[in-house]
Curated annotation (Swiss-Prot):
Name of the gene encoding the protein in the UniProt record: APH1B
Gene Ontology MF, one: endopeptidase activator activity
Subcellular location(s) of the protein: Membrane
Membrane spanning stretches: 5-25, 32-52, 71-91, 115-135, 158-178, 186-206, 213-233
Organism: Homo sapiens
InterPro entries associated with the record: Aph-1
Keywords: Membrane, Notch signaling pathway, Transmembrane, Transmembrane helix
Official protein name in the record: Gamma-secretase subunit APH-1B
Membrane topology: Multi-pass membrane protein
GO biological process: amyloid precursor protein catabolic process; amyloid-beta formation; membrane protein intracellular domain proteolysis; Notch receptor processing; Notch signaling pathway; protein processing
GO cellular component, one term: plasma membrane
Oligomeric and partner information: Probable component of the gamma-secretase complex, a complex composed of a presenilin homodimer (PSEN1 or PSEN2), nicastrin (NCSTN), APH1 (APH1A or APH1B) and PEN2. Such minimal complex is sufficient for secretase activity, although other components may exist. Interacts with PSEN1 and PSEN2.
Length: 257
């Protein structure tokens, strides 16, 4: 039974991300490099966030329980802010690299920023999902594990779906974020930051599984729709894609936009 929970939750959390990688990235070496670079940027942001949280914890050591709770909330919000800062830094790096490639070899077609936004967002999302869910997933293999410390038996299933949401949201956030940077609409960056903070804040009321998942999926659908439109999608292009009549639909179009 525990093996079924383990593999079921693993496929729920990482199955869509694995499918995206296999069908849209694995066949292109350059995309794999950008994906790994995006994952590395997220790892560096996590390292810096951990250092900030550790220093804050040392400063307020031996304080009462509520203070420790506020420290945890502070750490989560700082982590989100640093992640978005590194997303912006990665955008600037990719922009400079694209401009440098054009100046060195004008005849070379550089990958579109929309494609790079998707790939980097998937890199952010996969690494975020791995670090947030792997420990919980390993506990599901325990002998007769139902819940953790009296939690609901649905805890693992809830965590798997939340991990799925976070991974896909990072993809959508990446596309919307890069689009805002390209158009110099800085309010879009603020919206990405606020929605990221909102989804992260929901983890502090994790006992309300139904409410958390419903609100997270609403944000996912809204951000997914926004990302689809920002990537140049339309009802017509979606129809052509579903009918397999447009081979250059969105991500497979290599023309710089």
């Amino acid at each position: 039974m525990t093996a079924a929970v383990f593999f079921g939750c693993a496929f729920i959390a990482f199955g869509p991300a694995l499918a995206l990688y296999v069908f849209t990235i694995a066949t292109e070496p350059l995309r794999i490099i950008f994906l790994i670079a995006g994952a590395f940027f997220w790892l560096v942001s996590l390292l810096i966030s951990s250092l900030v949280w550790f220093m804050a914890r040392v400063i307020i050591d031996n304080k009462d329980g509520p203070t420790q709770k506020y420290l945890l909330i502070f750490g989560a919000f700082v982590s989100v802010y640093i992640q978005e800062m590194f997303r912006f830094a990665y955008y600037k790096l990719l922009k400079k690299a694209s401009e440098g490639l054009k100046s060195i070899n004008p005849g070379e077609t550089a990958p579109s920023m929309r494609l790079l936004a998707y790939v980097s967002g998937l890199g952010f999302g996969i690494m975020s999902g791995v670090f947030s869910f792997v420990n919980t997933l390993s506990d599901s293999l325990g002998p007769g594990t139902v819940g953790i410390h009296g939690d609901s038996p649905q805890f693992f299933l809830y965590s798997a779906f939340m991990t799925l949401v976070i991974i896909l949201l990072h993809v959508f956030w990446g596309i919307v974020f890069f689009d805002g940077c390209e158009k110099k609409k800085w309010g879009i960056l603020l919206i990405v930051l606020l929605t990221h903070l909102l989804v992260s804040a929901q983890t502090f009321i994790s006992s309300y599984y139904g409410i958390n998942l419903a609100s997270a999926f609403i944000i996912l659908v809204l951000m997914g729709t926004w990302a689809f439109l920002a990537a140049g999608g339309s009802c017509r292009s979606l129809k052509l894609c579903l009918l397999c009549q447009d081979k250059n639909f969105l991500l497979y179009n290599q023309r710089s936009r």
